[in-house]
Amino acid sequence: MPAPIDGAFSLVDHFGTPVDQRSYGDRHLLVFFGFSHCAVVCPRELAKLGAALRALGPLAARVQPLYVSVDPARDTPAVLRACVARHPGGFVGLTGSEAQVEAAKKSFRVFARRVPDAAAPGGYVVPHTALAYFMAPGGRYLAHFAESLDAPAVAARMTELMQGDTP
């Protein structure tokens, strides 16, 4: 049986402030792992998750979306700040040392590995798990959303989970 999603992390946000899963108070967390140089999957998923958050209406105030970098060598806080600014939804970019990012990946059971690619910026890409994780306040795992789900389906499931998990 696979290990459960732990949801723990200790990283820095896109302003350089240390954060962990408890830093967002009574808000649910919508967590997506990716990297700023991703050309297709990450921009598409961030747009979809942003649309899902907009579809929540007033409930969106109870959710903090997080974009966790799997490429800490390139994704500094400043790079992530610029990256999340291009995507609606109020995402906070998170990064850290290689060890911190590896610990967060392990906690969420995320696969990501640097692969050489001469055509890519910096000479490599980082294929990674493309799931969004929905966590209760404090970091308890509630659900994950596959890449194949559209924004209305994600919004409906988040609404259902928040109504059953009142603060």
Language-model segment annotations:
Residues M1-R22, A47:
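N-terminal "domain-start" segment that seeds a small globular fold
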Residues D6-G7, L29, T129-A130:
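Short loop/turn microsegments at loop-to-beta-strand junctions
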Residues V12, V92-G96, R113:
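Short acidic-hydrophobic, aromatic-tinged amphipathic segments that line or gate anion-handling sites
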Residues Q21-E45, L49:
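Short active-site neighborhood of thiol/selenol oxidoreductases, capturing the structured segment around
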Residues L30-V31, P65, A132:
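Hydrophobic beta-strand anchors of alpha/beta hydrolase catalytic cores
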Residues R44-A104:
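Structural microenvironment flanking redox-active thiols in thiol-disulfide oxidoreductases
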Residues Q100-R157:
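Thiol/disulfide oxidoreductase modules built on the thioredoxin-like
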Residues M158-T166:
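Short, hydrophobic alpha-helical segments
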